[in-house]
């Protein structure tokens, strides 16, 4: 009998912080299951979830403003430990009888917190000692408002020069508030603090590991699917690849994968996918070469969004045709991951700002009447990668730089043609190969080549040629929300440019994109 890896669980209420998903990932890294819900959940929902502890996230709003978010009253009546982070601390203080005010001195960035009283959350955790012999913590602050009076049954545990209540605690009720962000790496002991809260104060067992997640997923899929057959669109990307191997472990040959080669993949990618999953792992794969069909559909289309929608529509058509040949299939598998679920929930409640147009199997016709299998829907991307390693997928494949769903369709600017894709594939392969050779690939967050539909004069030997231009793009980023262009060495860029121009007949000029995000986006389209 498998362990119930969901038995100990943390509930994180989201007040809108940019770090909230990071907070959830940190709890998962400790080995404990958690879920992320909007702040305005009902008492019944919390009771039904039955958390071992609750964390209130940070957020961009001010508790001093009318109508600002509040934690449900039941949070403080449930009898479980509660940790308030930044805004979460402020709403905890205000709701339990303290006071919060807007501060003239805002704190953004590094700060030193001096611990002046004992407390379970921080005992024995420190970065340094003060002149008075107190523990000092290096933390990351990001707040304008601050608590100016704590609830009467709380004690002050720590402060900074400008924040008198940096940590507050009610040990009897196991309520804690921290004005800083323990989830970010800039708070050096942050993970240690979260570990103390989750494992010791909440009493959770660390059951959430790659091996136990795989075991749990296999059991649940077998229960869900029974003796039926399943179809999966396999792209060779991380999510669909891990989904395929999990399903294969659960139901073996009753899984049929459909790999659609749209002609917009990287150099030799189709062959690599078939070798990896067909030959090495023994999956049942239908390989559909639909390059001509996709390129025909894209003919004459230059608008990026129109290209995306066309690629998505044709994929659905091709996949639907293949699925229709398999009437015995009763289930459709998808590589939906937890951030997709969070995004969809936010969209449904009207709390999301921008929802990307996805071009996956989610648009399949309703008449297919297939049940849905989503074995990754509880997992963050980093967890999916760890499970992939546990299942035997190569590190280099799982940790490749991001590749857009529409593939080269959005890296060829303007109209997409086979000639352009073939040139771009070869140029990009040279760039990536040289990054690996120079040990630079893992030092940048994303690197790729873009095809520009303009010709430039070049000189080869004694003659002139009028050929195409490509741009190299490499960025460094933590969250892909903002990014800096990577300062690659000049001699490296020169070597890449020289190889592309000499080895890829049809390209006469190579440029390097030095735009940051913002104002530019990482991808050109």
From Swiss-Prot:
GO cellular component: cytosol
UniProt keyword annotation of Phosphoprotein present: no
Pathway the protein takes part in: Purine metabolism; GMP biosynthesis; GMP from XMP (L-Gln route): step 1/1
Binding residue positions for ATP: 235-241
Annotated GMPS ATP-PPase domain residues: 208-400
Signal sequence region: none
Pfam family, one: NAD_synthase
Subunit structure: Homodimer.
Name of the protein in question: GMP synthase [glutamine-hydrolyzing]
Organism the protein comes from: Edwardsiella ictaluri (strain 93-146)
Phylogenetic lineage: Bacteria, Pseudomonadati, Pseudomonadota, Gammaproteobacteria, Enterobacterales
GN (gene name): guaA
């Amino acid at each position: 009998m498998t362990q119930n890896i969901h038995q100990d669980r943390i509930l994180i209420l989201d007040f809108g912080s940019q770090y909230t998903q990071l907070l959830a990932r940190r709890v998962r890294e400790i080995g404990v299951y958690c879920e992320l819900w909007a702040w305005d959940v009902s008492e019944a929902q919390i009771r039904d979830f039955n958390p071992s502890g609750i964390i209130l996230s940070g957020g961009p709003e001010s508790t001093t403003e009318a109508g600002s978010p509040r934690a449900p009253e039941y949070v403080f009546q449930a009898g479980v430990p509660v940790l308030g982070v930044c805004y979460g601390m402020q709403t905890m203080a205000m709701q339990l009888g303290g006071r919060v005010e807007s501060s003239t001195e805002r704190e953004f960035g590094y700060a030193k917190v001096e611990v002046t009283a004992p407390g379970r959350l921080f005992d024995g955790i420190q970065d340094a000692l003060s002149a008075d012999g107190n523990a000092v913590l290096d933390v990351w602050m990001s707040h304008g408002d601050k608590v100016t009076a704590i609830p009467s049954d709380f004690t002050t545990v720590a402060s900074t020069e400008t924040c008198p209540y940096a940590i507050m605690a009610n040990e009897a009720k196991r309520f804690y508030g921290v004005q800083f962000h323990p989830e970010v790496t800039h708070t050096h002991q942050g993970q240690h603090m979260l570990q103390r809260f989750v494992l010791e104060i909440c009493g959770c067992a660390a059951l959430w590991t790659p091996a136990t997640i795989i075991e749990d997923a296999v059991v649940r899929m077998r229960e869900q699917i029974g003796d039926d057959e399943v179809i999966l669109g396999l792209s060779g990307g991380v999510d669909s690849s891990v989904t395929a191997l999990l399903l294969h472990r659960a139901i073996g040959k009753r899984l049929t994968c459909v790999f659609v080669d749209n002609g917009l993949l990287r150099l030799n990618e189709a062959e690599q996918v078939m070798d990896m999953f067909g030959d090495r792992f023994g999956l049942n794969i239908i390989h559909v070469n639909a390059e001509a069909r996709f390129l025909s559909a894209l003919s004459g289309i230059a608008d990026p969004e129109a290209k995306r929608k066309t690629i998505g529509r044709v994929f659905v058509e091709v996949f639907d045709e293949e699925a229709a040949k398999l009437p015995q299939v009763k289930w459709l598998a998808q590589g939906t991951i937890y951030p997709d679920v969070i995004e969809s929930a936010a969209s449904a409640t009207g709390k999301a700002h921008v929802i990307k147009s996805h071009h996956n199997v989610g648009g399949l016709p309703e008449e297919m009447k297939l049940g849905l299998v989503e074995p990754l829907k509880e997992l963050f991307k980093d967890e999916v990668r760890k499970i992939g390693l546990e299942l035997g997928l190569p590190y280099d494949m799982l940790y490749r730089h991001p590749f857009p769903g529409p593939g080269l369709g959005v890296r060829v600017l303007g109209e997409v043609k086979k000639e352009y894709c073939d040139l771009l594939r070869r140029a990009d392969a040279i760039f990536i190969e040289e990054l690996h050779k120079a040990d630079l690939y893992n030092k940048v967050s994303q690197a790729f080549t873009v095809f520009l539909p303009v010709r430039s004069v070049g000189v080869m030997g004694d003659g002139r040629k009028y050929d195409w231009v490509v741009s190299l793009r490499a960025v460094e980023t933590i969250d892909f929300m903002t990014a800096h262009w990577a300062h690659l060495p000049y001699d490296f860029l020169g070597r890449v440019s020289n190889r592309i121009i000499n080895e890829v007949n049809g390209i006469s000029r190579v440029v390097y994109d030095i735009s940051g995000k913002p104002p530019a986006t990482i991808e050109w389209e």
